[in-house]
Amino acid sequence: MNAPARIMCTPATGRPISVLIIDDSAVARASLSRMIEGVDTLRLEAAVDGAARAITALNEVHVDVILLDLEMPGWSGLAALPELLVAGRGAKILVVSSTARSGAEATLRALAAGAADTLAKPEAGHLNQAFQSVLVDRIERLGRAMLHDRAASPFVLRDEPVTAISLLAIGASTGGLSALAAFFAALPRSFTSPIVVTQHLPPSFMPYFADQLSAMAGRFAHVAQEGRIIEGGEITVAPGPDHLLVTREGADFVARLSDQSTATRCYPSVDPMLASVAEVAGPRAVAIILTGMGRDGTQGASRIVAAGGSVLVQDRASSAVWGMPGSVAQAGLACVAAAPAALAAHVARRGAV
């Protein structure tokens, strides 16, 4: 196995990003530890063989990012995830597991339970410099996002329109699955307007993601198909890498797919979806921007507001990463900032057309 390289980085946060490793494999712990210790902007606080030891460690030290294996004997990483979130006091959990190689189900279950991101762990002999570069990038993005969230500037909310909603568009990224679960659990079935969703995920995950949304929401969810009518009360999901756009044909909203380039380089992207929703629904369009890194959704949100529609964002306290919603709020585009369940209550009060 190649020795991990020492990566020289320029600290962007003023202090190293602190990391805790949880993996029952001694070989994996040693390899991951060397990778962390080989980066100037990261600091390894501890490497433990199970969730119970991790919770003990978290009582003594505070970390920014937790690397979590899912497949561990006894108390699995997936089962322990909720308690690790509590013990971590705001730490972001990056699932680093071989399970993430084999399919979407375990990965999406971890994301729905509150993991911020996932990374497929290669076999022991392939924990090399290429993997180290990807791992370090994921850790630093999560760590920087968390520290940026804490330093975010105040913002002013716009007046909230009171018109009924003809089309609801939701965008999310990091931490989005748990936020969507909370939102749809609180959205009554009496809300019957069409719903379109763009969640940053690999295209191969989208069918299972749609199935999960169906179970979460108690309403039919499906991956968008070119030319299919977007029915009331249903959830249509952007397929990736193509974006989901909405056109209008008579009284019907219709799904269109696009591979257009975007400023955010997200595929699928929230921005083109919102721009199309603004065009077809105007003042009866509502966009919700949930937790996620980056600025995807800000340009689209400006189009929604310009068309007379309204934009709601997840608040900082409940977001895994307040990048996307924070960008929209600080641009002065949001009329509501709240936890997902409260956002659902706002939508329900507005009602459907």
Model-found features: residue ranges?
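Conserved acid/base catalytic micro-environments in cytosolic active-site loops
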Residues: 1-21, 25-41, 47, 51-55, ...
